[in-house]
Amino acid sequence: MKSSDLKEYIRKELDGSKEKKIGVVLIKPEDYREATIIISEYFLSRLKLKGIYVTLNMPYYSILENLKKNDINSSKLYFIDCVSKQASGFKNIKNCCFVENPESLTELSLAITEAINTGNFNFLVFDSISTMLMYNDLKIVERFVHYAINKLRSYDMDGALLFINDEKSKELANVIMQFCDKFIAL
């Protein structure tokens, strides 16, 4: 999909309701990076919200660079990074919490809960649920994501749960969709 078409389509799908909503976003691999930028831009710039960005497949600093290249102010984002600590070490960063790895669901759950409990955030982007399937059993990921969705609802937060459009992820997305308000296929 062309860049401008992708942006217009995502905005159209996310717009329309003033109510808080949680959505499953199924993304083609070739559109993945651009779609994550567009979704972040939507919440940060268009809606002017503060949010949590959980990353399981790229270090937070790579996401920061991508946002900066696209003139998106990331100062209202808090990152939960499940990559950097395992890959290359980490530093204490004010707007980032480091989780051991994508397999550490208890640690990830605690980090998400701690961030949400501050009451400072309006949305959460989960990038990507598909990566969790590489490290964890399908049923465990289903339960974890259901827990996360309930946590978002209890704090009246928006959420974007990102999936790669492949067979294994589709199986999980089909289960998770029943707990969500919106389904977007790119």
PLM regions with names:
Residues 1-66:
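Glycine-rich P-loop/Walker A and Walker A-like loops and their local beta1-loop-alpha1 context
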Residues 9, 70-98:
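Nucleotide-state-sensitive switch-loop elements of NTP-binding domains
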Residues 24, 52, 123-126, 160:
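Structural motif
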Residues 47, 73, 178-180:
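Short, structured coil segments at secondary-structure junctions
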Residues 56-60, 83-86, 157-168:
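Short beta-alpha junction loops
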Residues 88-144:
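Phosphate-binding/switch loop-helix module in NTP-utilizing enzymes
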Residues 141-167:
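Substrate-engagement module of ASCE P-loop NTPases
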Residues 157, 164-186:
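Phosphate-binding/switch region of NTP-binding enzymes
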